[in-house]
């Protein structure tokens, strides 16, 4: 109505219209994300801005390290971050059963949704009820299973670890697609639909596939060199 008032044509896609007339600074890694060749936007990719200054529960961290050091078997980390799923606990239980069968160990980051909170910890399971930053967790893992949020995807990428994504909302299916396309992990899983056999097959692939390990380590080195925070600060200063 406002555009008609001033004799302007209607806009079918406001997001595209606004982006086309602005300078777009993309806060993701060029080594993980990509751009559409059909874009007519003015854009640059500056790298992800990691925050490694989070306060955390030191006791929870020390308990996690004790669990890590208690054996030599592979470690998987699972989290849904700030997302929730009515199938989260069923999926968590399936992961525990798989870890017991194959002698893997599982760390579950319960998060806001308290995923897996009803499970009983044992030598195969550590339930992390208090938050610990990703940069202190992922270097100890052999694989990470997560919801596919941009931040978690980049944190696993920076750590140089294989990942398996269980996308739920928004951009998560995109990151799931990219991780598999780049050879950094198996094709994503739908928590609500995946059978126990499919979960087991993809978890074992995540942990044992040497190609994922090689590709993830290479990508990790490149992401660590990007300097996303410095890049965006430099970009802002150039506009002044």
Named regions from a protein language model:
Residues 1-240:
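Catalytic core of nucleotide-sugar-dependent glycosyltransferases
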């Amino acid at each position: 109505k406002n555009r008609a008032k001033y004799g302007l044509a209607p806009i079918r896609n406001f997001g595209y219209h606004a982006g086309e007339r602005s300078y777009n600074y993309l806060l993701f890694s060029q080594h993980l994300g990509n751009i559409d060749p059909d874009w007519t936007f003015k854009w640059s990719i500056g790298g992800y801005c990691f925050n490694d200054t989070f306060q955390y529960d030191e006791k929870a961290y020390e308990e996690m390290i004790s669990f890590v050091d208690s054996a030599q078997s592979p470690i998987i980390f699972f989290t849904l971050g700030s997302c929730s799923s009515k199938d989260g606990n069923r999926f968590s239980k399936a992961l525990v059963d798989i870890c017991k069968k194959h002698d893997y160990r599982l760390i579950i980051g319960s998060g806001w949704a308290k995923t897996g909170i009803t499970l009983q910890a044992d030598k195969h399971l550590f339930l992390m009820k208090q938050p610990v930053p990703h940069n202190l967790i992922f270097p100890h893992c052999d694989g990470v299973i997560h919801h596919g949020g941009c931040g978690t995807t980049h944190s696993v990428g920076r750590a140089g670890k294989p990942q398996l994504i269980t996308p739920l909302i928004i951009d998560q299916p995109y990151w799931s697609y990219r991780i598999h396309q780049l050879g950094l992990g198996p094709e994503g899983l739908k928590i609500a639909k995946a059978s126990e056999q499919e979960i087991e097959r993809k978890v074992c692939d995540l942990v044992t596939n040497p190609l994922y390990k090689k590709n993830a380590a290479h990508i990790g080195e490149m992401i660590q060199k990007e300097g996303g925070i410095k890049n965006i600060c430099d970009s802002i200063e150039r506009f002044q």
